[in-house]
Amino acid sequence: MWKHVKQVDPEIYEVLVNELKRQEYGLELIASENFASLAVIETMGSMLTNKYAEGYPQKRYYGGCEWVDRAEELAIERAKRLFGAKFANVQPHSGSQANMAVYLALAQPGDTIMGMSLSHGGHLTHGAPVNFSGKIFKVVPYGVNLETETIDYDEVRRLALEHKPKIIVAGGSAYARIIDFKRFREIADEVGAYLMVDMAHFAGLVAAGIHPNPLEYAHVVTSTTHKTLRGPRGGLILTNDPDIAKAVDKTIFPGIQGGPLMHVIAAKAVCFKEAMTEEFKEYQNQVVKNAKKMAEEFQKRGYRIVSGGTDTHLFLVDLTPKDITGKAAEKALESCGITVNKNTIPNEKRSPFVASGIRIGTPAVTTRGMKEEEMEEIAEMIDLVLSNVTDENGTVKPEVREEVSKRVRELCERFPLYRDKIEGVEI
């Protein structure tokens, strides 16, 4: 593998090998990350990257599209079957592009949209002031009840009645509970708004049938394909409404994108096929079991879990009682081979660059085959590290760093990732 890269560009070859080592021998707990199969990776690295295919299958602006048409048709049909949708657009380059396409298809610049506040668990593209969504549209953020730390649906309704948004966005990037899509649709209908659900984080759980399918209530659903879905980096838009489908297609192309990434679209097709297997359903069930188990283990060790637990693949740990910042925790854990991300918590007092919490997700470690027993071990190691941070820069006592780093390596060696499947690369 990568023999041609090694010959042509030794510096990039070094990057590839070192990143492979990092993934192989480190514990990946960032909730938005996962490990794609070699089938997905091979497809992404194929000659399909050479083909321009502006337009849609059978309606291209270029010749020579017979086989890329077939790839996109497979991706569309599989996405529709997987999620029970009548229409699917598989061309968005990312989840952000998918969200932008829906906004521009259903609203005009200056219209009002409602989305979950970033500090309460939402996403940048749900109306954050620094994002295009917050610059193009008037944004009314909603949040969680500060006591329960779950969505305050009464407040969502009050805000919707007051501001009459064109689009209400449900979904988030750091919200651990199942969302009441029915309630959101009732609110949307009451004010004449479209309901858009961003299921980027929990799409894999939906595909496996262990999480409510937002398409039952949403006018339109967006997603990424690389988180719990375990596919290539990219976006997806689903709907059952032919008029919305038409508007979305026109907004993606020629509205905000030119040539689609055919190597990625083909890899999406592979990912959707993998997601239809019984093995994938078992995997997603284990992802949730692992998240619940690890959250419980943190609670046993005196940590506060935002909203008291999780229904999904992720949870937020409030580090305030431990007198350590999210920034320091992230750095400390990374020095020991454990990757998490700092995260704001509801009623956050610190800047998002420092934050009071960390977000933890189990998709990647579950892909390795780890189960509840390993979650207990991981929680114990994280607690050991965070209990031995000596300063605000996340410095860990040397003996603890050495011990945990060794244990992380040993655990990863027990659950190999790519090591036994890749030829020609020494790691």
Swiss-Prot record:
Its cofactor is pyridoxal 5'-phosphate. (6S)-5,6,7,8-tetrahydrofolate binds at L118, G122, H123, L124, S351, P352, F353. Its EC number is 2.1.2.1. SUPFAM superfamilies: PLP-dependent transferases (SSF53383). GO terms for molecular function: glycine hydroxymethyltransferase activity; pyridoxal phosphate binding. Its main location: cytoplasm. It holds the Pfam family SHMT. Pathway: One-carbon metabolism; tetrahydrofolate interconversion; Amino-acid biosynthesis; glycine biosynthesis; glycine from L-serine: step 1/1. It is an enzyme of class 2 (transferase). One of its GO terms (cellular component) is cytosol. One of its GO terms (biological process) is tetrahydrofolate interconversion. InterPro entries: PyrdxlP-dep_Trfase, PyrdxlP-dep_Trfase_major, PyrdxlP-dep_Trfase_small, Ser_HO-MeTrfase, Ser_HO-MeTrfase-like, Ser_HO-MeTrfase_PLP_BS, SHMT-like_dom. It is found in: Cytoplasm. The keyword Translocase does not apply. Belongs to the SHMT family. HAMAP family: SHMT (MF_00051). Homodimer. This is Serine hydroxymethyltransferase. It comes from Thermotoga sp. (strain RQ2).
